[in-house]
């Protein structure tokens, strides 16, 4: 039976206090959000414009635009009925035992004469262990062991790459490609010139006509390596083109298997739109299939056993956190705002998909809160609010005082108070982690965000289509990447002194790229529906205005090229050598970008959350993996 078809049980008490301080318990608004939204009587809603958009008469007698978004998919009663046996101490004890056994495996392959060590493939063993624990989502337990392994591999790295073992003189493509990727992601300096030697006289990667599993795996690792290229690395661009074509052809010829499923997954999600938890779930399923076919070695079997236990332990925590998110949403009065998209479960799925560290509940819970308000503001500025109302709300946020509600229409008052209290609450939480007041950062980000939205609302009301440059400059901010990232990361157990924050927040290159990628990718997925709602300005329409005679297809091709270029630039911003701003300080902001990108893989996965996004919720949050 599908998990979605289960009849919800009686609501259970929130278990939030069992894993986080009671001071963080979600609480209801002091004043529930006003029910002045759409009239609940069906006869009061008069459709017009198009199937994807309509106008409706609100309770205050104003004809308003609405988006006709589908309703919340996840009833609170259903969420409160979720239960999992994997929170029991016996599973934690089992995980600790397995962690010790995996550490022992790491130690044995690090011994010069260890029983598992062969000088013929020791480098590949180290790299495979690191790659496996990371893909299986259990690497947090083995940071010391990972560094020892990578230091060892790097000591044998040369300008010609490496072979599978330290005694192998000739480099091979598989080990070199895997090593390049893993080493670069961990901050080691490696150059793509190592791949030049694998080219034939025609300048193409040399490979035999026979598509053996070993050769296919080598090209798969080459493809994975090509995804973390920097903008100027021509050889990596060539490697990506070649490996993409090779793997697509291989899928047409090899039988359906765990290898074909792995190839399809990597081709589909690449790296910048991949969610770590979805990758973990997928890789667990692939290894489970190999285990059934008795093709796993002893080391990988042990890793798989630990990964399944860890996945399900975190799954239990996810469900507890999700209950609190749903309770907060319900008690806040948000369900009465019938003109907005209710996507709190989807936001939680995103954030728990990029951070599986159990102790970071505060980060995950508050990310959902911020994104929930982003959605309210998005729908308010895009459709429901009148221009006069939106100007009043924007001015009230600049005042940042509860008394500012006096000048607001009734339905905005509750939104403003809840936004005010939540942003202040998150700033107090951030103070505990950062040891300084960060409220001004948050307020400035919010003001900039609403300013960009007010400008877009003005464009909608007047039918104005700006130049592409003007549109994108504003769209970097209205994409909401900055506001969704800034306050949540400040609640992590990671220090963000001013010199580090300025490399991630506005106006840094990192922030600029992440915001523009999200805006460009979002528009390619949303522009047709937005246009049907009367929102003419998009990166597609602006490009076509700037380039008379161009077609939508040409505009999309140009924009997709811009996205790919910016992705490589963002790779550099994340991975560039910088002793003052380590990769670890930028990783969460980068992963938020990956998560947001993921939801636009096939469509606007927030607005239309009843297809791929629904399946993602089930696969990564609601269902455990079979033990």
Curated annotation (Swiss-Prot):
It is found in: Plastid, Chloroplast. Pathway: Terpene metabolism; oleoresin biosynthesis. Keywords: Chloroplast, Lyase, Magnesium, Metal-binding, Plastid, Transit peptide. Residues 1-46 form a transit peptide. Binds 3 Mg(2+) or Mn(2+) ions per subunit. One of its GO terms (biological process) is green leaf volatile biosynthetic process. Mg(2+) 1 binds at residues 378, 382. InterPro entries: Isoprenoid_synthase_dom_sf, Terpene_cyclase-like_1_C, Terpene_cyclase_plant_C1, Terpene_synth_N, Terpene_synth_N_sf, Terpene_synthase-like, Terpene_synthase_metal-bd, Terpenoid_cyclase/PrenylTrfase. Gene3D superfamilies: Farnesyl Diphosphate Synthase (1.10.600.10), Terpene synthase, N-terminal domain (1.50.10.130). A motif (DDXXD motif) lies at residues 378-382. One of its GO terms (cellular component) is chloroplast. SUPFAM superfamilies: Terpenoid cyclases/Protein prenyltransferases (SSF48239), Terpenoid synthases (SSF48576). It catalyses: (2E)-geranyl diphosphate = (+)-car-3-ene + diphosphate. Mg(2+) 2 binds at residues 378, 382. Mg(2+) 3 binds at residue 530. Its cofactor is Mg(2+); Mn(2+). One of its GO terms (molecular function) is magnesium ion binding. Its main location: plastid. The Asp-Asp-Xaa-Xaa-Asp/Glu (DDXXD/E) motif is important for the catalytic activity, presumably through binding to Mg(2+). Belongs to the terpene synthase family. Tpsd subfamily. Terpene synthase (TPS) involved in the biosynthesis of monoterpene natural products included in conifer oleoresin secretions and volatile emissions; these compounds contribute to biotic and abiotic stress defense against herbivores and pathogens. Catalyzes the conversion of (2E)-geranyl diphosphate (GPP) to (+)-car-3-ene. This is (+)-3-carene synthase 1, chloroplastic. It comes from Picea engelmannii x Picea glauca (Hybrid white spruce).
């Amino acid at each position: 039976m599908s998990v979605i078809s289960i009849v919800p049980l009686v609501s259970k008490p929130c278990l939030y206090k069992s894993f986080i301080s009671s001071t963080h318990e979600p609480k209801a608004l002091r004043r529930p959000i006003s029910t002045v939204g759409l009239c609940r009587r069906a006869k009061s809603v008069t459709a017009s414009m198009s199937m994807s958009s309509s106008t409706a008469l609100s309770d205050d007698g104003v004809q308003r635009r609405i988006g006709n978004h589908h309703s919340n998919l996840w009833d609170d009663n259903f969420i409160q009925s979720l239960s999992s046996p994997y929170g029991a101490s016996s599973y934690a004890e089992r995980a600790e035992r397995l962690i010790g056994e995996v550490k022992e495996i790491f130690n044995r392959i690090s011994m010069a004469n260890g029983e598992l060590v062969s000088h013929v493939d020791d480098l590949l063993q180290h790299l495979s262990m690191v790659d496996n624990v990371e893909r299986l989502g259990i690497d947090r337990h083995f940071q010391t062991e990972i560094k020892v392994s990578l230091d060892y591999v790097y000591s044998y790295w040369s300008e010609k790459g490496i072979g599978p073992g330290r005694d192998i003189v000739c480099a091979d493509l598989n080990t070199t490609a895997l090593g390049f990727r893993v080493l670069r992601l961990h901050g080691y300096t490696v150059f793509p010139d190592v791949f030049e030697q694998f080219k034939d006289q025609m300048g193409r990667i040399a490979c035999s006509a026979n598509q053996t599993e070993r050769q296919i795996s080598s090209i798969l690792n080459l493809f994975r390596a090509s995804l973390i290229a920097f903008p100027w690395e021509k050889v990596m661009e060539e490697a990506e083109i070649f490996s993409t074509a090779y793997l697509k052809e291989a899928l047409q010829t090899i039988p359906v298997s765990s290898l074909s499923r792995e190839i399809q997954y990597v081709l589909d999600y690449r790296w910048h739109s991949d969610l770590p938890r979805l990758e973990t779930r997928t890789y667990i399923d692939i290894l489970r299939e190999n285990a059934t076919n008795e093709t796993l070695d002893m080391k990988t079997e042990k890793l798989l056993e630990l990964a399944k236990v860890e996945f399900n332990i975190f799954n239990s925590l996810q469900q507890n956190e999700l209950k609190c998110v749903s309770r907060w949403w319900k008690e806040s009065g948000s369900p009465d705002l019938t003109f907005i998209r209710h996507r709190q479960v989807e936001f939680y799925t995103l954030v728990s998909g990029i951070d599986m560290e159990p102790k970071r509940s505060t980060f995950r819970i508050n990310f959902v809160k911020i994104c929930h308000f982003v959605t309210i503001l998005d729908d308010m500025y895009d459709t429901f609010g009148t221009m006069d109302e939106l100007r009043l709300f924007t001015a009230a946020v600049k005042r940042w005082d509860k008394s500012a509600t006096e000048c607001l229409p009734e339905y905005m008052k509750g939104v403003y108070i809840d936004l005010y209290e939540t942003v202040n609450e998150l700033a107090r939480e951030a103070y505990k982690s950062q040891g300084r007041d960060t409220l001004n950062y948050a307020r400035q980000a919010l003001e900039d965000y609403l300013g960009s939205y007010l400008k877009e609302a003005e464009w909608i009301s007047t039918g104005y289509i700006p130049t592409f440059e003007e549109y994108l400059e504003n769209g970097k901010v209205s994409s909401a990447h900055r506001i969704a990232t800034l306050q949540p990361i400040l609640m992590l157990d990671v220090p963000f002194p001013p010199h580090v924050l300025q490399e991630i927040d506005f106006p840094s290159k990192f922030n600029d790229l992440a915001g523009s990628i999200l805006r460009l990718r979002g528009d390619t997925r949303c522009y047709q529906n937005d246009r049907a709602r009367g929102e003419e300005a998009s990166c597609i329409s602006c490009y076509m205005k700037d380039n008379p005679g161009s077609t939508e297809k040409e505009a999309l091709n140009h924009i997709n090229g811009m996205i790919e270029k910016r992705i490589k630039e963002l790779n550099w911003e994340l991975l560039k050598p910088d002793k003052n701003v380590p990769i670890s300080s930028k990783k969460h902001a980068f992963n938020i970008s990956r998560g947001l990108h993921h939801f636009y893989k096939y469509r606007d996965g927030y607005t239309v959350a009843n297809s791929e996004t629904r399946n993602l919720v089930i696969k990564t949050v609601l269902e455990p993996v079979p033990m």
